[in-house]
Regions:
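Local beta-strand N-terminus motif with an aromatic residue
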Residues: 50, 119-121
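Conserved beta-strand/loop positions that form the S-adenosyl-L-methionine
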Residues: 56, 79
């Protein structure tokens, strides 16, 4: 069954923009997107050089936000392709005031565009 669009989705995503990694300019073809890399600078994104853990398919963010709360010395990146779902994860991170978690609203096939090789400590 298809999930209904959340009310005020665009406004809610804008309110959580500090937790969302921009994917502007993402091409429709994943192979083209991978060739045209736009690697994330983790030190710039998080403001530190801590290890980075990736969760693919983070859903509503319960697991990743709890991990980020328990381990402030680790940076977390959650990936979820559905904006309708990722907004809930971003709101949880914002409510928990978790500076060590960010979200990428994209399909896992596009990750090689954003994630530098051998830069993730754990998936």
């Amino acid at each position: 069954m298809r999930m209904r669009r959340k009310r005020y989705l665009d406004e809610r995503l804008e309110a959580c923009s500090a937790y969302i990694v921009s994917t502007e300019g993402e091409k429709l073809n994943a192979l083209e997107a991978i060739r045209d890399t736009a690697y994330i600078d983790y030190e710039k994104l998080f403001g530190n050089g801590n290890k980075v853990v990736l969760e693919i398919g983070c859903g509503k963010g319960g697991f990743i936000c709890e991990c980020a709360r328990r381990h402030p010395e680790i940076n977390y990146i959650g990936v979820e392709r559905t904006r309708n779902v990722i907004v809930t994860a971003c709101e949880k991170a914002m409510q928990g005031n978790l500076p060590n978690v960010k979200f990428i609203p994209t399909c896992a096939a596009y990750l090689p565009r954003y994630i530098p090789p051998e830069s993730i400590s754990r998936i």
